[in-house]
Regions:
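Active-site metal-binding core of divalent-cation-utilizing nuclease and nuclease-like domains
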Residues: 93-116
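An alpha-helical interface "stripe"
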Residues: 69-101
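Buried hydrophobic packing segments
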Residues: 80-84, 138-145
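Conserved catalytic cores of phosphodiester-cleaving nucleases, focusing on short active-site segments
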Residues: 79, 112-128, 140-141
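Short amphipathic alpha-helical segments and their helix-coil junctions
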Residues: 53-66, 117-126, 200-204
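Nucleic-acid nuclease catalytic cores
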Residues: 128-135, 143-180
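Mixed-charge intrinsically disordered linker/loop segments at interdomain junctions
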Residues: 2-10, 168-202
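Charged, often low-complexity linker/regulatory segments
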Residues: 1-78
Length: 205
């Protein structure tokens, strides 16, 4: 019988999941979910403002030589937030920053960015490094949102983990309680149009 990951009587926050060295499938299994990695076909918007994308890219290239982005806060401020601000300007959705959720002793804390539209939600976690361990934290946050949302709509929760230079997406299929990690990653700023298209596609679907 595998050793339990969670200790009795201890309260876990989302950031604790980043410190866990267990594989994602073992962590989510203890929370009652299954896990899969595969090629995800994510919604994409074709209605992309090319000028907006170019402005974001130009601003990044102009400012990045002048600042240090070796902290989580700096990556959020200069590499992630500008993309999200661009998305929110073009759609009908609400963006919460450092959104507090408390479900139970295992699932509580702050979600970096929480997008909510009429149809879909996106949980976005920003880390300064280590995409894999960051994904464990994202998984916990997506499961927390699933449990926190009282109704069954939307039937899918989207998530993204970003270390600034790299993004990876995931979905949580609520009905069958399965978390799916996309096998692909997207680079910033090289794949900025793809990242923007996916975020907008999810929220406007």
């Amino acid at each position: 019988m595998p050793k339990k990951i969670f200790k009795e009587g201890k309260k876990y926050t989302f950031s604790d999941y980043f410190e866990m060295k267990n594989p994602t499938d073992e962590i989510v299994a203890e929370l009652g979910y299954s896990f899969l990695t595969k090629n995800l076909v994510l919604p994409r918007s074709e209605d992309i403002d090319e000028a907006l994308i170019e402005n974001l890219r130009t601003a990044y290239y102009a400012i990045i030589p002048k600042i240090s982005v070796n902290s989580e806060a700096s990556k959020r401020e200069f590499m992630i937030a500008p993309i999200l601000q661009g998305v929110i300007r073009t759609i009908e959705a609400k963006l919460n920053i450092e959104y507090a959720i408390e479900v139970d002793e295992r699932l509580s804390g702050l979600i970096d960015y929480f997008f909510h539209s009429k149809q879909d939600v996106i949980v976005i976690e920003a880390k300064k490094g280590d995409l894999e361990r960051g994904f464990n934290q994202l998984a916990a946050e997506m499961i927390a949102v699933d449990k926190y949302e009282e109704n069954d709509s939307p039937n899918m929760i989207y998530g993204a983990i970003s270390i600034g230079e790299v993004w990876r997406f995931a979905i949580l299929e609520r009905e069958i309680k399965r978390l799916v990690k996309d096998i692909h990653t997207f680079r910033f700023p090289e794949d900025l149009q793809d990242i923007f298209s996916i975020l907008k596609g999810i929220l406007s679907s």
